[in-house]
A protein has these predicted regions:
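N-terminal hydrophobic alpha-helix used for membrane targeting or insertion
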Residues: 7-9, 38-39
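Hydrophobic h-region of N-terminal signal peptides that target proteins for export
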Residues: 10-18
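Positively charged n-region of N-terminal signal peptides that target proteins for export
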Residues: 1-5
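Extracellular/lumen-exposed scaffold segments
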Residues: 18-148
Length: 148
């Protein structure tokens, strides 16, 4: 009976603690061919209401910018830098600087030059997400995007 009580307690603690894990950003990926040797990789962040992630282009001394890191491959080469749409920008009194961010949804794009008919674009995105009262620690999310 004592073992059963302990097991039940641990199950309840597990359910309660998992309910407190915040994941306000979900990521989706796809690749779109634009020619026989070129493609655009699209990396979409869907952001919960009230939360935001930061632009790739922030001055040092502010919050953590979003960063894309692509694994080297013989199957493709990056063509330029990862692009983003125009962010919302405001002056932050705490940081004493302009801060650029995205709410709701944002699609980042990376052009690639293909060296083979198919490829897998692998890498990670590092981002920080905040709402009006808190920021979560920067998080790494790995991805692998097939290009067919």
């Amino acid at each position: 009976m004592k073992k059963l009580s302990i097991l039940f307690f641990l199950m309840i603690v597990g359910v309660v603690s998992s309910a407190q894990i915040l994941k306000p950003v979900s990521w989706a990926y796809k690749a779109k061919r634009i020619s026989k040797t070129e493609a655009v990789v699209q990396i979409r962040a869907t952001i919960d209401q009230g939360w935001h992630i930061y632009s790739q282009h922030l001055a040092p001394g502010g919050p953590d910018a979003t960063v894309f890191t692509f694994a080297p491959s013989k199957d493709f080469a990056l063509n330029g830098k990862t692009t983003e749409p125009k962010p919302t920008t405001y002056f932050d009194k705490s940081y004493k600087m302009n801060i650029s961010y995205f709410e709701n949804q944002v699609v980042f794009q990376q052009k690639i030059k293909l060296n083979k008919a198919t490829a897998a674009v692998k890498g990670k995105v590092t981002f920080m997400v905040c709402d009006d009262t808190q920021c979560l620690p920067a998080e790494d999310v790995n991805f692998s995007i097939p290009v067919k």
